[in-house]
């Protein structure tokens, strides 16, 4: 009587392992980019939260809070899990005939890796900076001091060439 052998041969198993290895070689870098992009998006969220503070400061003719501000003031920065956003710049208050797409002189500098202590940040964006320049209409555009790789900059603020 003949006995039937069941199962996979060594060659078949090696082919499956090779296919999984090839798929992983493409998937892991793409996943790392996805994580870095999602962490970089937090910076724009922090900057959006600072818009109200900037508007309050502009009432006093300055982008940043006065050093002698009262105890109830929030300050010129906001910290998230992965980033620190800080208001800066000089308000262009004497400019006349400004259009909504003109810059008002205020900036928000987002430094990645300076967020909440213990938060693990992607090495692709750690210590990178995204500078945002505020427009007269309150929205942001990418500033010149940005060191963050272009693929991680949120599309809403990406500079057009």
From Swiss-Prot:
Modification sites for N-methylphenylalanine: 8
UniProt protein name: Fimbrial protein
Keywords for this protein: Fimbrium, Membrane, Methylation, Transmembrane, Transmembrane helix
PROSITE patterns (alphabetical): PROKAR_NTER_METHYL
Compartments where found: Fimbrium; Membrane
Transmembrane segments: 8-28
SUPFAM superfamilies associated with the record: Pili subunits
UniProt xrefs under Pfam families: N_methyl, Pilin
Keyword Transferase recorded: no
């Amino acid at each position: 009587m003949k006995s039937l052998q069941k199962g996979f041969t060594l060659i078949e198993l090696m082919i499956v392992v090779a296919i999984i290895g090839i798929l992983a070689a493409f998937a892991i870098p793409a996943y790392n980019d996805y994580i870095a992009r999602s962490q970089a998006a937090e910076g724009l969220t922090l900057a959006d939260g600072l818009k109200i503070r900037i508007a309050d400061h502009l009432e006093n003719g300055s982008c940043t809070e006065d050093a002698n501000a009262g105890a109830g003031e929030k300050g010129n920065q906001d910290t998230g899990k992965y980033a620190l956003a800080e208001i800066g710049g000089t308000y262009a208050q004497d400019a006349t005939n400004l259009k909504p797409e003109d810059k008002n002189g205020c900036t928000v500098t987002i430094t990645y890796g300076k967020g909440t202590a213990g938060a693990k940040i992607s090495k692709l964006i750690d210590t990178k900076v995204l500078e945002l320049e505020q427009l007269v209409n309150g929205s942001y555009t990418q500033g010149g001091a940005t060191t963050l790789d272009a693929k991680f900059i949120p599309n809403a603020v990406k500079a057009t060439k």
